[in-house]
Amino acid sequence: KNVIGFQEKEGFKVAGKFPKLVGLTDGANLEIHVLKLGDEKTATKLKLMQVNAKKKTQILDQSYIHTVTGFSYLTIFVNDVEQVIKNAKKHGYKPHAQSPQILPPGLPQDVCLLMLKDPDGNFVEIVGPLTEKLKNR
């Protein structure tokens, strides 16, 4: 949230039998964190679920997007890619591979893609205006 600029809003908890009844957990309680990108009514909201499970989680090798099945990729559109890069570095993250890059020919050329990886190894694609470095290529 601090890297991209999300603001944490009031979250909620889901306990009791419900998480198991709908197939989310094996009975463990959920704590849902709600993040919002901007103050507008239509601003993007992201809900992250934290599970208080007694079982140890399995760490997977997510070197590339195709090395695991399931969701491992999230795209977020921002107004300032350079600010995201600064925030990422401040929190110990660096751009993944050789990103940011201008989109390939045939796609908008005034937009760049920054790839980050979250602490769980998921890919977080940041799309927004070109950075100064890319503008001056």
Where would I find each of the regions flagged by the language model?
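Vicinal oxygen chelate
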Residues: 40-43, 50-120
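Core segments of cupin and vicinal oxygen chelate
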Residues: 1-43, 90, 107-109, 117, ...
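Residues that form or immediately flank small-molecule/cofactor binding pockets and catalytic motifs
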Residues: 13-16, 53, 100, 131
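Short beta->alpha transition motifs characteristic of CBS
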Residues: 126-133
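Hydrophobic beta-strand residues in large extracellular and virion-surface proteins
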Residues: 35, 46-48, 126
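Flexible, disordered linker segments and immediate boundary regions flanking tandem C2H2 zinc-finger modules
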Residues: 136-137
